[in-house]
Every structure is written in C-alpha cells, then in structure tokens.
C-alpha cells in the first residue's frame, strides 16, 4: 500500500492504517523533537503532543504538500506550544532536565545547546530553519514550505545564522 492510500485510510478512521502511518513517521517526529529540545524527556513530551495532534488533525491534510512537510509543520507547532507551556510553568528554566552545568552532558551537547539557545535569540524561525536545513537535510525550498516562508527567506536566515556563528567562533577563539 502506498503512502497516499495509507493516509486516506487513516483519515477515514482506519486505526490500523493510522498505526502504520505513525510507525512510519514516529522516528522523524521524535528525532526533530529531540533536536529541537535537546533533552530526551522533553522530546518525548513533544513527540507525544505531536502524535495526539496528528490524530486530531489528519483529517485536514489535503495532499497539497508532501506529507512529511505537513508533519514537520505539525511537530514545530507542538514544540512551540510545549515551550510556551513550560514558560508559563517556570519562567526561570525554559528547558527542564539537565542544566548546562550538571556534568551529565558532553562538551558537544553543551555547545549545541548553547548554539540553539542563541539561535532562538536571533529571532523567530531561526532555530527551526537551522534544524530543518542542517539537521534534517531539507533544501531551502522544502524548509520554506514547512515554515510557510519563501525560499529566499530561508536562504537569508541561513546566511544570518552562518554570519552569527562566524562571529561567535571568533569570540570563542579570542577567549571573549
């Protein structure tokens, strides 16, 4: 059975088809949630929200975009909703779980977490753009479709991110 048939059957209420669809895409959902949040427990929460939202939203999928593109949008929305709910609960600790200084993370993990936090500070969509293009391997056009912006906007964001990271690396190498 091809993906379109599987989606159509799941939209019609076929629980087995929905389960197969979820099995096919769960790794993608979790991987993006983990890369976005950088903490397993948070990624599990986001993935769970995404699976629930998928169940409630699948009927609205109209095959106008690739299913994976539509699914990335859904996961990003869930991640942003999760972040807002965390901010309401605790303004001081955006990401529950391991802190930067608790010793449980490698230097690479700490560096990546710091970079992702800096990307959030650059403005809306920067973190998601970097993750979609560099971590998920989407083209600028595909990332633009997921985020609802033009390909040129994605290219500009990637340029801005690279420029910022170049300045960051210069500061790090100078010991600032």
Please provide the spans of the model-predicted regions:
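Short, charged helix-capping/linker segments at alpha-helix termini
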Residues: 9-20, 30-49, 151, 174-176
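Sigma70-family region 2
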Residues: 11-12, 35-38, 48-66, 85-87
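Amphipathic alpha-helical segment used for protein-protein interaction
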Residues: 12-15, 87, 99-131, 136-146
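Amphipathic, Lys/Arg- and hydrophobic-enriched alpha-helical face
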Residues: 22-40, 57, 119, 168-171
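Structural recognition of an alpha-helix C-terminal capping motif at a helix-to-coil junction
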Residues: 31, 45-52, 65-77
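Arg/Lys-rich amphipathic alpha helix in sigma70-family domain 2
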Residues: 56-63, 73-93, 108, 160
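DNA-recognition helix of helix-turn-helix
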Residues: 76, 80, 126, 135, ...
């Amino acid at each position: 059975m091809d993906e379109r048939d599987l989606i159509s059957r799941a939209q019609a209420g076929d629980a087995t088809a929905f389960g197969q669809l979820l099995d096919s895409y769960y790794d993608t959902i979790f991987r993006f949630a983990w890369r976005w949040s950088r903490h397993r427990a948070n990624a599990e929460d986001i993935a769970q929200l995404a699976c629930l939202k998928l169940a409630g939203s699948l009927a609205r999928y109209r095959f106008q975009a690739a299913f994976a593109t539509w699914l990335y949008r859904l996961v990003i929305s869930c991640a942003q909703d999760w972040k807002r709910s965390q901010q309401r609960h605790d303004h001081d600790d955006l990401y529950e779980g391991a802190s930067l200084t608790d010793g449980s993370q490698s230097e690479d993990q700490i560096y990546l977490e710091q970079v992702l936090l800096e990307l959030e500070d650059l403005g809306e969509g920067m973190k998601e753009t970097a993750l979609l293009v560099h971590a998920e391997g989407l083209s600028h056009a595909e990332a633009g479709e997921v985020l609802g912006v033009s390909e040129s906007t994605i290219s500009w964001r990637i340029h801005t991110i690279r420029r910022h990271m170049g300045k960051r690396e210069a500061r790090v190498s100078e010991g600032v």
